[in-house]
Amino acid sequence: MRRFIPKRRILLFSDRLSLRFGRSRGKVVTQSIRMLLGSPALEVVARIVLCFPFWGSGLAKLIDFQGGVAEMAFFGLQPAVLFNIATIITQLSGSALIILNRATWLGAGALGIFTALTIPLVHHFWKLEGERAIVAFHTSTEHIGMIGALIIVAILSERRRRLG
C-alpha cells in the first residue's frame, strides 16, 4: 500500500516576505518595488549605466585621441586614426540614442554590431594561448551578455513607444 505524502507548497519570494513581515508588509514591499521599477528617473539611470562602457570609452578616446589611435594600432586595426574616429562616433552616438530614448533600436543595433565585431577583431581567444586566451574568452562572453542587454533595451523601448 502506498503512503500518501502531501506535496510541499513552493513559496514564492513574495510569499516569504508576507510570512516574515505579515501580509500588509509584503504588499508594501511589492508596491514599492513596482513604483521604483516604473520610475522614469530609474529608467534614465539604467540607460546611462548600461551605456557606460561605450560612452566612457568614447570620451576617453576623444579626450586622449593619440592614446585611442595607439590602442587601434596595438590591435592591428589600420588605418588607426580612422578606426579611432569611427569608434568614437559609434560609441558616443549609439549611447546618446539609447540614453535619450530616441531611435533606441538604431543606437542599440549600432553598439551591438560594434561589440560583436570586437570579438573576432580584438578578442579572438581561439588564436591566443595561455592567460591571454582566458582573458579574451571572458571578455568575449561579457560582450555577448552586453549584446543581449542591448537587444532588451531596444525591445522595451519599442514596447513603450507602442503603448504610448
Model-derived regions: residue spans:
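Extended, low-polarity transmembrane helix blocks
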Residues: 2-63, 81-164
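Short juxtamembrane and helix-loop transition motifs at transmembrane-helix boundaries
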Residues: 65-78
